[in-house]
Each structure stands twice: as structure tokens, then as C-alpha cells.
């Protein structure tokens, strides 16, 4: 893979909420400090897990957490990570090899809404995808909203952030990975064979994939629409495609 597209980078990050923080601890994600504003079984469990991981725990009041998070919902639990480390595309391919199956990758093109990105990550992890690829520009990053919306899944699945999505797609094709773009003009998604190495490309709501990325796709796939609306939320559509791949690949 191109070195520019395949170098690890880090980003300061907060993880908010009980379940996302617990999942980050289970995944041994690097955390500097956990701030707790509450008591009870869950808070005690988080404190114990943090201690076992060598993470500093500070008991604070709710006002302190509001100062840290603004208006975001924190449930009385905030983890300050040393960094949010992005994977490389090679990491994702190696993960597929270690799992003993053909690569199953999700590419997000211009998904700027962190709630959508978080929901896509959550579904991708649940569906057993090997990783997510996002562009550096015009994309949500692995921020606190993404972590919270993913319900902790962002701690378990590698996310690569690349400078040139089009060139990465070319490199994936060279590795015999078929690129399937989700697009209203595509063929019925149930008519294609999703075995083998695959990557789904999910574009932004309203605009879809960029012109160049769309042209790079080997196939375009669509969902049949029988009602009055002509599109679905990006994360909902992505979930349907992912689980069709799961169904076919686990026959």
C-alpha cells in the first residue's frame, strides 16, 4: 500500500458514556484518565476495570464533566484517551488473513455526520467486517460522538483514515477485492455474489458517492424502494448490505 495512505496517525479523544468506556477498557485501548460522577454497581465496575488496566480514576462532580463535554450526554463517565489511533489499510487486510477469510471492508465516502459513522461502525463490527476506511477530508473523525454512537464498537474494529481514497480503491482492486458502491442507479443487491474479497462504498446522505469514487466501483448496488420515500439513512442502508454479505458468506 502507498505509504502516504498507510501510515498510522493519532488524535486526542474523549469517550463518553458507561458502555463505550467499558468497551474501551475491555479492548485495552490506551486511556489516560477516567472521570466518574456517580456511584453504584456500574461505576464500581468501571473503577475496578480501570485499576486493573493501570488507568487513573478521578471522582468528580457533574459540573466538571459538563465543562469537559459541553452539552454531550456523558452518563457520569468520561475517559480521556492518550489518543485515538487510526489503523492502516494493511492492518485491515492482515486482520482478514488472520481470521482466515477473504477481506470484508467498509469504505465511507464523505460521511460527515458522526452519528451515521458511529452507527456504521457499530453494524460493521457486529457483522464481522475486517475494518473501515474513511478519507481525511470531508469525513467525521473518531471523535466522542462516533465512539458513543458506536456503543463501544469503535474500540474493536480498525478504522483507517487515508489521504487519497481513490488510490486506495485501486490498490484494493489489485488485491482482487471487488468494490461495490451503494447507489440508487445500481442493480438489485440480492442479485450479486458477495463471496470473495469485497468492499462496500457508502456515500453521504443526499449526495451519495463522489463522482470519481463512483467511477472506481466495479459494481453499483441498490435497495428496492416500495414506499413513497426514495432513500434510506446511510447507516441503515449500509447495515442491509452488510448483512446480505454475511448471509451469503456464511452459507
Q: Which residues are covered by each model-predicted region?
A:
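N-terminal positively charged helical leader segments and presequences
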Residues: 1-95
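Structured adenosyl-cofactor binding patch, chiefly the S-adenosyl-L-methionine
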Residues: 22, 27, 144, 148-153, ...
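RNA substrate-binding interface of SAM-dependent RNA methyltransferases
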Residues: 23-30, 41, 48, 94-187, ...
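Active-site/ligand-binding-proximal alpha/beta "capping" segment
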Residues: 180-233
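Short basic, glycine-rich beta-strand/loop surfaces that mediate nucleic-acid
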Residues: 68-82, 150-153, 158, 162, ...
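Short beta->alpha connector loops at strand-helix junctions that form conserved
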Residues: 61, 82, 109, 135-136, ...
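Short glycine/serine/threonine-rich phosphate/pyrophosphate-binding segments
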Residues: 115-119, 209, 238
Amino acid at each position: 500500500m502507498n505509504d502516504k495512505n498507510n501510515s498510522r496517525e493519532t488524535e486526542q479523544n474523549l469517550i463518553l458514556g458507561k458502555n463505550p468506556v467499558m468497551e474501551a477498557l475491555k479492548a485495552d485501548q490506551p486511556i489516560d484518565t477516567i472521570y466518574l460522577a456517580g456511584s453504584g454497581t456500574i461505576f464500581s465496575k468501571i473503577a475496578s476495570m480501570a485499576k486493573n488496566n493501570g488507568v487513573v480514576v478521578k471522582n468528580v462532580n457533574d459540573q466538571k464533566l459538563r465543562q469537559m463535554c459541553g452539552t454531550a450526554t456523558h452518563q457520569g463517565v468520561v475517559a480521556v484517551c492518550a489518543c485515538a489511533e487510526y489503523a492502516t489499510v494493511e492492518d485491515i487486510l492482515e486482520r482478514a488473513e488472520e481470521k482466515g477469510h477473504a477481506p470484508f471492508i467498509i469504505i465511507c465516502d464523505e460521511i460527515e455526520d458522526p452519528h451515521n459513522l458511529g452507527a456504521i461502525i457499530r453494524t460493521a463490527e457486529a457483522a464481522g467486517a475486517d475494518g473501515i476506511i474513511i478519507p481525511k477530508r470531508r469525513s467525521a473523525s473518531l471523535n466522542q460522538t462516533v465512539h458513543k454512537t458506536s456503543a463501544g464498537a469503535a474500540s474493536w474494529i480498525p478504522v483507517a483514515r487515508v489521504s487519497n481514497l481513490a488510490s486506495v480503491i485501486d490498490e484494493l482492486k489489485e488485491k482482487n477485492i471487488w468494490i461495490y458502491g451503494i447507489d440508487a442507479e445500481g442493480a438489485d443487491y440480492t442479485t450479486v455474489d458477495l463471496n470473495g474479497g469485497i468492499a462496500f462504498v457508502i456515500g453521504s446522505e443526499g449526495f451519495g458517492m463522489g463522482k470519481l469514487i463512483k467511477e472506481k466501483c466495479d459494481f453499483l448496488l441498490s435497495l428496492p424502494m416500495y414506499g413513497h420515500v426514495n432513500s434510506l439513512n446511510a447507516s441503515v442502508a449500509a447495515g442491509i448490505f452488510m448483512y446480505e454479505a454475511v448471509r451469503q458468506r456464511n452459507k
